[in-house]
Amino acid sequence: MGAAFHCHAQDNDDFESFRSGLMDGFQSFRQEVLTGYTDFLRTAWEDFNVFRSESRDSKPKPRTAPANHPTPAATPPAPGPAPAVHNNITLDFYGTRLMLPALKVAALRSSDNNGVADFWQALDSQGLGSKTGNALKEIAERHRFNDWMMLKLVETYVSNQLATASADTRIAMRQYLLCHTGYDVRVAQNDGCLALLVPYSTTIYSSSYIDVDGKRFTLVFDAKSGRTTACGSVRTYRLPGERNAGGLIDPVFRQAPRVTESMVSVKLTDKKTSVACNVNANLAKLLYDYPQIPLIEYSRSSLQPSFRKELTSQLRQTTAGMTPEAAVGTMLNLVQHAFKYATDQEQFGFEKPLFPEESAIYGINDCEDRALLFSMLIRQVTGLDCLLVEYPGHVACAVRL
């Protein structure tokens, strides 16, 4: 049985309001949540059952591309790094150079509740939450990072600065910083080590999670620990339900991030249609471990407007004067024949839907990637309504003609 999702142009007003409110209300957030947070950490942690989220689609995809029966017929430059400040470091974040305060912290003495609480107190005594939290938020605002990019920024920053520390120290540090940038990210014990509890705003497929008072938290381990899934139950704390515990991690790119560009020229062609465009290859590095989320969320994201404008403007000229049916057929032919076909397992070794920019960078994709690209072209070139339709082992795009 399939599922259909309506694709439409996104509206960034809600995102801008959310981001502005998040930043403007940070001081009240600290007063409500962070004051006394160590007291909650010191409470007796409870056991929670771990669940495994569903896979997006367990049926294997076809090893060859489905046959096509055709119908007859600008990103702003990334801001430069902030002016040099004493005791700051320069961080390479997927090709974008960022300036952040150097981190000097004592190691976590133990991974139990009191050890984590003591770690928080030591960081608070340095004023680290305000200083570093504000620096991270300023970068996210200036570079238009979404919540998932903030999650990755904190991971990259802590891994760089605490490379020789224990995995538990890095996890505790990441949780502290994410709390101080406005998110309800928590920490838990699992099989002798610490894990982050990340509250996503949408389903994350093929992940371990727990439910705390009706709120789903995805478990995230330190990359150097070798852990990717939970073993047995998880121990963590509760926050009083009436408190503003912080925001969720929204992985959707509501606005295009301002990242350093490493432009490559690509040519997409079939026997009749050819388009040339430039795409930022740095996006492939950034998005390599992007989480598996519902396909409709990919269609709501904006990554590199200049690439999409360049691509769609050429196709708008190519299809000018065509009937809707002929225009749709022309773009379908291009999407089906401009790329080599490979399943995600063959290309990456794991399930990975591609944004249109990634399809252009890799030059290889599968049915779901082509459906995402095709639906974007339909919306932006013709303005026609379309649906992403999911079948077991296959994804298609239905167009209203």
Where are these predicted regions, by residue range?
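N-terminal propeptides/low-complexity segments immediately following signal peptides
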Residues: 10-57
